[in-house]
């Protein structure tokens, strides 16, 4: 989402933006113009010959891509239409869970951004949802239904109802980290977060939740508009997507989980001005490279914050990998209501397998 000046740029102007003379190295004259390489080492996982495939279209606001190994399917949400959908090779796209994030559990603005946003799996294979309209994090059995029964995991901090949980990840030691900006109170005419009698927390928080004892602690409230979250491979750092909705300066931040110190890993002001779009979802590849939405597509940086590549999917909300990182899956945006995938180079040796953190 975005302040009017920047979000209208991302929604209305993006389709007219041309590839600019940004200081990157073009490795070949015949590879797809959808891929821009800034550092050749990224070619270990990016295939310049890969084509971008459209898996789904006419999804009002796609988000929350999550690979379901059990069904060999991609799950994703449509925030505006309040549903979870499923895609696989055999059946294509189908409705999966409805309603997904606005069931009447909590008072909300009643505006469009009230469906479920991020998805994840708990240790038992149940589906975890960030429910923007219900203003909670909940779980449900991972199966198709149009009469869902959700179990609340957390819906308040110190007795005050959450804003509208947005993204959720799970650490290797079982803790849940989630962001809670107030996008459930976004006025879609002005693209501003509005005051509401229903809003009880006056900051945009990032929280740590212990599913065993239900303890909830505040990690930080110092990020003006936190969105996507991811953990570094060593689990020592929390990567935070700070949107540019208030200051037109989207960033990838790096929070030390021990000291809580926050540093800027990547400043996205320049590339957002160049290509449009804001910062949203984020995932970490097993190589340590960080994939995230921004700059009119998906940007890739290394763990030091160096820009490695840009893939022009159009304006995007989020991305995900399948089990073996064979494909990159991308969810579009309001002006780009599609779900895509692109084949990656495998970083695995024959006979080797990895476990992908589904955050």
Residue ranges and their predicted role:
Residues 1-29:
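Bacterial Sec-dependent N-terminal signal peptides
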Residues 24-359:
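Sequence-structural signature of mature extracellular/luminal beta-sheet repeat domains
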């Amino acid at each position: 989402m975005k302040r009017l000046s920047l979000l209208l740029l991302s929604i209305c102007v993006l389709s007219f933006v041309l590839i600019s003379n940004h200081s990157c190295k073009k490795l070949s004259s015949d590879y797809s113009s959808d891929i821009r390489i800034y550092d050749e080492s990224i070619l270990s996982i990016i295939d310049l010959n890969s084509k971008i495939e459209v898996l789904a279209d006419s999804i009002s606001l796609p988000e929350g891509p999550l690979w379901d190994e059990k069904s060999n399917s991609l799950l994703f949400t449509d925030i505006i239409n309040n549903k979870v959908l499923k895609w696989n090779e055999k059946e294509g796209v189908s409705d999966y869970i409805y309603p997904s994030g606005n069931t009447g559990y909590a008072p909300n603005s009643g505006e469009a951004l009230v469906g479920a946003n991020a998805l994840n799996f708990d240790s038992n294979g149940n589906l975890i949802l960030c429910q923007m309209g219900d203003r909670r994090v909940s779980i449900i059995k991972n199966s198709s239904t149009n009469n869902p029964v959700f179990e609340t995991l957390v819906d308040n901090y110190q007795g005050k109802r959450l804003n509208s949980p947005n993204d959720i990840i799970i650490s290797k030691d079982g803790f849940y980290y989630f962001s809670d900006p107030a996008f459930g109170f976004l006025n879609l005419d002005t693209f501003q977060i509005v005051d509401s009698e229903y809003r009880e927390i006056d900051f945009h928080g990032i929280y740590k939740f212990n599913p065993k004892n239900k303890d909830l602690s505040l990690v930080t409230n110092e990020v003006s508009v936190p969105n996507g979250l991811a953990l570094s491979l060593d689990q020592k750092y929390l990567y935070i997507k700070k949107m540019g909705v208030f200051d037109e300066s989207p960033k990838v931040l790096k929070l030390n989980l021990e000291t809580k110190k926050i540093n800027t890993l990547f400043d996205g002001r320049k590339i957002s001005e160049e290509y449009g779009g804001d910062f949203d979802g984020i995932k970490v590849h097993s190589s340590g490279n960080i994939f995230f939405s921004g700059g009119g597509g998906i940007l890739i940086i290394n763990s030091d914050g160096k820009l490695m590549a840009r893939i022009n999917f159009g304006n995007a909300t989020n991305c995900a990998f399948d089990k073996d990182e064979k494909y990159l899956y991308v969810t579009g945006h309001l002006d780009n209501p599609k779900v895509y995938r692109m084949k990656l180079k495998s970083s695995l040796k024959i006979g080797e397998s990895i476990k992908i953190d589904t955050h």
